[in-house]
Amino acid sequence: MRHPLRAWAARSTELLDDPEADERDVVASLRDIARINRVFGGAAAAAQRLDEFLCPIAAGATISLLDVGTGAGDIPRAAAARAARRGIALRLIGLERIKAAAREAARAGGVAALVADGGRLPFRAASVDLVLCAKVLHHLPGEPGRQLLREMNRVARLGVVVADIRRSVFAAAGIWLASFPMRFQPATRRDGVISVFRGFSPFELGAICRSAGVSAAVRRHPGWCLTAAWRPGGCA
């Protein structure tokens, strides 16, 4: 039987999934999420997995990175700063279905933001070096999530990284308690707990990837972060 809090999360609507949400609330939530990514390790986890594909790349190279569901663009910018220390330039493309989010990603600079559907990426096959999505998959249960993974696999040339949340009551309690001293918006506090209970176990994330036709290497990270990575064509 599904845990009652998982059932509650499954039937709840997060602010970023609400087409009627006020733009100011969306932007405030995105800025809170950027702090969560920094403090709880989401940005670091994604960057670590991207490093696996960047390691063979020589200094002086320029590599394209598409971030699907980029939010405020904080994770690709963190990855670019990390790559720059190794002499690699990342050309950042941020894709969002929410116009306010695309504007917020572009506002801080460094990310070429566009509005499009992650289930139908507007790129040719193997036209982007690296493709990332962070904390997006738990918003897309079932076939929409599998379609996103297939599309990411299609457009990537070197590698794909999916970063999300490892489901845990401790993670839910942690984000709830941290939200007060960090002065999160009330919507972020609620949605943070919803997101945790919509998250995955390592086995579940691997199974979703397999059901989309890709074989991913799944890893745990500090801060209840979970990642999956593979090379295009489905080989981990």
Each PLM stretch: what is its role?
Residues 165-212:
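C-terminal alpha-helical "lid/dimerization" subdomain adjacent to the S-adenosyl-L-methionine
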